[in-house]
UniProtKB/Swiss-Prot annotation:
GO terms for cellular component: plasma membrane. Interacts with the Sec translocase complex via SecD. Specifically interacts with transmembrane segments of nascent integral membrane proteins during membrane integration. The keyword Transmembrane helix applies. Belongs to the OXA1/ALB3/YidC family. Type 1 subfamily. Required for the insertion and/or proper folding and/or complex formation of integral membrane proteins into the membrane. Involved in integration of membrane proteins that insert both dependently and independently of the Sec translocase complex, as well as at least some lipoproteins. Aids folding of multispanning membrane proteins. This is Membrane protein insertase YidC. GO terms for molecular function: membrane insertase activity. It comes from Burkholderia cenocepacia (strain ATCC BAA-245 / DSM 16553 / LMG 16656 / NCTC 13227 / J2315 / CF5610). It comes from the Bacteria.
Amino acid sequence: MDIKRTVLWVIFFMSAVMLYDNWQRDHGRPSMFFPSATHTAPAAAGGASGTGATTAGDVPAAAAGAAPSTTAPAAQAQLVKFSTDVYDGEIDTRGGTLAKLTLKKQGDGKQPDLYITLFDHTAGHTYLARTGLLGGDFPNHNDVYTQLNPGSTSLTGDQNTLKLSFESPVKGGVKVVKTYTFTRGSYVIGVDTKIDNVGTAPVTPTVYMELVRDNTAVETPMFSHTFLGPAVYTDAKHFQKIDFSDLDKNKANFEKSADNGWVAMVQHYFASAWIPQQGAKRDIYAEKIDPALYRVGVKQPVAAIAPGQSADVQARLFAGPEEERMLEGIAPGLELVKDYGWVTIIAKPLFWLLEKIHGYVGNWGWAIVLLTVLIKAVFFPLSAASYKSMARMKEITPRMQALRERFKSDPQKMNAALMELYKTEKVNPFGGCLPVVIQIPVFISLYWVLLASVEMRGAPWILWIHDLSQRDPFFILPVLMAVSMFVQTSLNPTPPDPVQAKMMKFMPIAFSVMFFFFPAGLVLYYVVNNVLSIAQQYYITRKLGGVKKKPA
């Protein structure tokens, strides 16, 4: 009995430790077991910009087509502000770069009057989307564009779309007109690059589209760290995350060319992604370009353009929340930016079910409660088998203690006597372990569903819980969880081994302290799960006791 419970506690504890260590590494913090280099590299002498950790053979030398350096010459430029129903933003006329993007429907958890800013370019933070041409002395993101047809830059009540166009200076016989199309209610931005050959010779440019970001960590609740960094998706390799640390060490491994897929920057709850046209050949690159500054992008070749002719390259830019159903409708595999890790195969159906329940009850907190009840109901036969095994072990515990006392000076005889007792009573000391172990992947999957789902962000439950993605402000749920864990422990007999007895008392305290800083939605799940487990164990144990009291 005591051995089995110790094994279960060790499994639970190690699972929690591994999850936390995974958060540390995904969030750019050193592993508790395998420390790695930090993301921020020493500043280069003189502040020079370069390609840094470019993988050999990945991006050619600058003259042959690498995206330009981030260092821009001094020139007059301005910020063009715009507004839609979902965005407030700024386009920098230097390069026609999308330099700031605020999500108007995503409030700040700590300051309700503020909104989440995804793209930004300030002294302390850089995150932007930009494009340009390679293959010659053509317009790129360092050149100052001119806004065409300046007028209203806001999406008015009678408009469904807002178009903003910017024209480059002529360079290398080429002029570029870049048009952003914003659609009402959509987090997908159309980006059209029109290339006009105004020279006297054919040109064969390449369009690059990239996301540039520093490695500044996103502020999240304690113990809620998820992946931050570039990602690539192709039909051949599917979803590939790229750690900033791998770019630091020039060890990033990802698909380098395709005619499908997308590239993205991923963070907790939000993402951005360049989505070129399906079937268009493109090269994919990801690299470090400055101390603590990285980029991921695609380079799409354009067929030769004769003098006086033009070519259009169309792409889409997603920038918004990681809402799973919305992402599924935008591009194949884009929903994978909502990263469940190795439990995706279980987590996705769980989120589908959670979403269906929410559709009926209209409250994510109650949806979590009902989903937990459903999961416990599904696993009731396994739980019953576990509790029955525990009850049988509890019955023979006095005899086990007597054997231990009798043979305490001879461990070999004691083990033989215990095995004989198990055989005689037809009891498996580990009989209650397997049913619990089988359920662990499901519980971990639900944990990641609640952690990764932006739908929980800002979602209230009842009374004092106004945001399920933030910790309980009054620590009521963590206290309830601590109480429930102590009740669960008290339902089982105290192990005869003093060390194991201390461990059984320490574990609830350790987990309770850790859960004080978990998002309220996660703690709610564990509280409900514990309460249901206590009820199940009480019911099954009482039922077994009633059966044994009946006359033969």
